[in-house]
Amino acid sequence: TATVGVAPRIMGYAPAPATRKILARTGLSLSQMNVIELNEAFAAQALAVMRDLELADDAANVNPNGGAIAIGHPLGASGARLVTTAVSQLHLTQGRYALCTMCIGVGQGIATILERC
């Protein structure tokens, strides 16, 4: 798991540097992620993060079951929802790695990588 802080005025951007930090820490690459669960605080925020990470706007492995806009953003449980959804998708697709990332109010971001055993 990796956490970062950015200026509060760009709080939604924090998943991008958090993702880069966890990838550097693990020696993995974004292309190795079979599933990416990016919490959508709002649509523009998710697109900004995806574009910064050089992911296609319609990347099939990003929120493959829909993101927070489609299935909900349970305040206080968003991280648990991301991880549960990612684990389920890894088992369904027999994938190996999942990235879960989200922004946190006032300029924080978090990212974690899961490996299916």
Which residues fall in each region the model found?
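Claisen-condensing/thiolase-fold acyl-transfer catalytic domains that form or cleave C-C bonds
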Residues: 1-117
